[in-house]
Amino acid sequence: MNRFWRVNRAVTIVSAAAMSLALAGSASAQETFKLGIVTFLSGPAADSFGVPARNGAQFVIDQLNKGSAPSPYEKVGFGGMKIEPVIIDENGGATKQVQELRNLYQRDNVDAVVGYIGSGDCLAVAPIAEELKKLLLLFDCGTPRIFEESKYNYVFRTAAHATMDNVALIRYMK
C-alpha cells in the first residue's frame, strides 16, 4: 500500500473521531474519547490494508494525545479529551463482525467506530449501527450496495465504492 493510502486512512480515522464529538453529546462529559477501530489484523488483507491502517491510526492518535499534531480545539487530544483506541480484528466474517460491533458499542462503550474493509462485513454491520443509533464510519467498503439498498443516519463512508474506482480506471486506460 502506498504512502498516500496509509495517510488517507489515518486522516479518515481522526476525522471520524472529530465528527463523532459533534454527534456524541455524552462524550463532552468524559475525560477520554473511546474510538473503535476495526481493520484486518490477521488473514490475507492484514499486510496490505489492515496493519498499515492500524499503524497509521495509532500514530495520529499518539500525536494528537501528545499535543504534537493540530487538533480541532488547540488542545491535547480532541477538546482536551484523550483519544483511547479500541482496536478489533476484522478477520472472521460478517457474523463475527456483527457481534464485535455490538460489543464495541455496548460493552466497551466506544463513542464511535471507524473501520471495515470487507464489503460483506460492511453490509452486515451498517444496520446494527443504525439500530443502536451510534456513529459508524466505513473507510474502505467496495460495495455500492450499502447506500443503494438502505438509508442511514448514523453510517457514513469516506471512500469511493468499487464501481467508481473501476469506471475511473477504464476511462484512464482508454
Which residues does each predicted region cover?
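Short acidic/histidine-rich motifs immediately flanking catalytic phosphotransfer sites
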Residues: M81, Y105-A112
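Short beta->alpha junction loops
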Residues: G77-G80, V86-A94, A160
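Extracytoplasmic "Venus flytrap"
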Residues: G36-Q58, I88-A94, I117-G120
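Cleavable N-terminal signal peptides
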Residues: A16-A17, A27
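Extracytoplasmic ligand/sensor domains, especially the bilobed periplasmic-binding protein
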Residues: T95, V110-K174
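Bacterial N-terminal signal peptides that target proteins for export
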Residues: M1-V14
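Signal peptide-proximal N-terminal region
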Residues: R54-P85
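Sec/Tat signal peptide C-region and signal peptidase I cleavage site
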Residues: L23-A29
